Amino acid sequence: MVSILDQPVANLAAKIRSGELLAMTLVSESLNRIRFHNGSLNCFTRVLESEALSAAAEIDRQVARGINPGLLAGVPFACKDLFDVKGLSTTAGAKNRIGSEPAAHDAEVVQKLKNEGAILMGTLNMDEYAYGFVTINAHFGATRNPHDTERLAGGSSGGSASAVSAGLVPFSIGSDTNGSVRVPAGLCGIFGIRPAENAIPMQGVFPLVKNLDTVGPFARSTDDLELVYRVLSHPSSLKTTNTSNVRKDLPIRVARLGGWFERNATDEVLDAVLTLMARLDAKAVVEIPEAEAARSASIIMTAAQGGALHLDLLSKDPMSYDPAVRDRLLAGTMVPFSLYSQAVQFREYFRKQVAKLFESFDILIAPCTPCVAPLVEDPTVWIDVKKTLARASLGIFTQPLSIAGIPILSVPWIREPANSTQLPIGIQIATWPGREDLLFTFAKRLEQDGLIGSCCPIQYDH
C-alpha cells in the first residue's frame, strides 16, 4: 500500500493549501511511520511529536482562515542533528554536546523551510561532528540502510538519507563537506545535492571545515529536490540560469570523469556509469590529473580545521569523543600550517583546472562511491587492492569535486533486476556554478527516460 507521504511534495502542499488534505493527517502518517520503522533504522536522535502536531494544527487553522501557509504547506521534514533548532541542544552527533546550551534560534535553513509551512519532525543521526562517511556513532548507534538493514546508510548525513529512503519524511536536510550528502544519498538510492559554494546559508550549522561546508537537501525525485533547493537557496541562487549557460538550442555536452574516478570502482558501479553514458550516446571521457591530489588537499584541510576547532576540548576531555573521530581530530592538530596553506593554495589551482573542463562540457558524470553499501559489521572498502575503513574511504570520488566548489547532484541509477543485488548505486552529475537550472533539467530528463529514479525499499512500502 502506497503511503500518502510518497506523493510529490508540491502535490501534498497544494492539497493542504486547498483544504483537500489536513496537515494533521500528513504529520500523523509521518509519526506512525517513524514509530514503526525507526527502531530498525535508527534515523532519528529526537522525534519532536508534540511540536509537529502543534505546527500541523496551526497550518490547518491558517488554511481555514484563508491564509496561504507557503510552498511547503504542512509537509513533514527532518534535519541532521547539526542544525540549530530553537530550544534544543545541537549535539552534532556528539555525546559531549548533549545538554549543551539550547539554541536561541533555528538555523537559517530550518527557518526558511518553516517559513514556507514545512513541519519539523525531529533531528537525525550522523557521524560525530560530521567527520565520517558511515554514520556509525559511538553514542547514538549506527543508522542502517533501508534497502538492507545489515548495511551502512553512509554518512555523515546517514540519518537524513535513510529517513527519506524509507519514506518516514518526504524530504530532509543534511550537510556536505567532502561528500556527506552525496555518499548516503547514493547508498540509500535517493536524490541529494551538494550546492555551489555560498548558494545556501550556513548560519546556525555546526561547522567542520568552514570553506568546504555546505547544506544540501535529500528527496525522492528531482522535482522534490529542486523545490526544496529553491526554498533553501539565497535569493541570488533563485534566478533562472541565463541563456548562455543553459545553451537551450544546443545539445547538452556530457563527459565521464575517468582516471581516478574509475580506478577503484567495482565492476557493478563502473558498469552503471558506462551504461548511462551509452544510453546518452555520450562518448567523451576526461581526466583530471590532479584528482588524487585534490582528495589529499580536502583531507588535509578537514583534519587541520577540525583539529583546530576541537583543540580546547580535546585537551581537556579527549575521552568524551567517539574514539574513531577523536583519533582523526588529534591527528589534525598536528598538521603543519605550511602543509595546510599548500592545500588551500592547491584548491584554487584545482578549481581553475575544473573550470577549463566546463569550457568544453556542460555536465560531468562520475560514481558517488566505489561500491554499494558495505556491511555495518564490516565497514570496509577495497582501495588500491587494500581493505580500508569505509569511514574515511567511501568518499574517494566525492572529495575531489568538493574542492572544486561546484554544484553536484547525487542521483540513483535504475538497475536491471536480472543482473543486480538491488542495492542502490549513486551517480554524481556536476556542472559549473550558475548552471543549476541546466543540472536539474538534465536530471529530470534522465528521470523521465527511466534511467534514474528512487525506489522505496519493499519492506517500507506500506
Tell me what each language-model feature is.
Residues 59-76, 246-255:
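Immediate post-signal peptide segment of exported/extracytoplasmic ligand-binding proteins
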Residues 20-28, 57-60, 266-287, 311-316, ...:
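Acyltransferase
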Residues 72-95, 251-253, 300-355, 367, ...:
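Short helix-loop capping/hinge segments that flank enzyme active sites or metal/cofactor-binding pockets
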Residues 11-18, 97-101, 213-220, 329-335, ...:
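Short, well-ordered beta-strand elements within core beta-sheets of diverse protein domains
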Residues 1-53, 64, 455-462:
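An N-terminal boundary/leader segment
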Residues 72-214, 366-386:
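Short glycine/serine-rich loop/turn segments
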Residues 36, 115, 165-260, 274, ...:
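Structural helix-boundary/capping segments
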Residues 11-14, 57, 311-403, 458-461:
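Serine-dependent amide/ester hydrolase catalytic core
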